[in-house]
Amino acid sequence: MSMQDPIADMITCIRNGQFSNKIFVIVPFSRLKENIVKVLKFEGYIINYKIKKNNNKVLKIFLKYFNGKSVIENIKRISRPSLRRYCNKRNLPIVMNNLGIAIISTSRGVMTDRIAREKGLGGEIICYVD
C-alpha cells in the first residue's frame, strides 16, 4: 500500500473487500479515516467498525451485504493530494439524485452533503458513495 494518499488506500481496500465478498477489512488507523467510517456506518453502508490496538492501531471495518450483493455499489475518491476539491454551501454536490452521498470534511467535522446543506457549511469533498 502506498501511503501517499491514505484515504484513497482505505477506499480501495473497502471496494476490493466487497468485490471479493470479505466479511471485514483492516486498514491503518487515523482520526480522519475513523470519521469517514462513522459517516458510512450512520448512513447504513457498513455494519460496524472497531479500533484494534495491537502494535499499531488499525480500523476493522465490517462490510454490509444485501441479498449477496454489496450495499456500496460505487465509492470514488474526489479530492486528492494533487488536486483538492472544495465547494461552498451553495455548490454542494448531489450524488445520484440524492440516492447516494458525498462525504465532506467541513470546519465542524466530517459529514454528508445533506447535513452540510442543512447546517449551511462547505468544505473539501472527500468521496462519493452510492
Curated annotation (Swiss-Prot):
Any GO MF annotation of the entry: rRNA binding
Keywords from the named record: Ribonucleoprotein, Ribosomal protein, RNA-binding, rRNA-binding
Gene3D superfamilies (UniProt xref): 3.30.1370.30, 3.30.1490.10
GO biological process, any: translation
One GO CC term on file: ribonucleoprotein complex
Pfam families attached to this UniProt entry: Ribosomal_S8 (PF00410)
Function recorded in the entry: One of the primary rRNA binding proteins, it binds directly to 16S rRNA central domain where it helps coordinate assembly of the platform of the 30S subunit.
Similarity comment text for this entry: Belongs to the universal ribosomal protein uS8 family.
Subunit structure: Part of the 30S ribosomal subunit. Contacts proteins S5 and S12.
Protein name: Small ribosomal subunit protein uS8
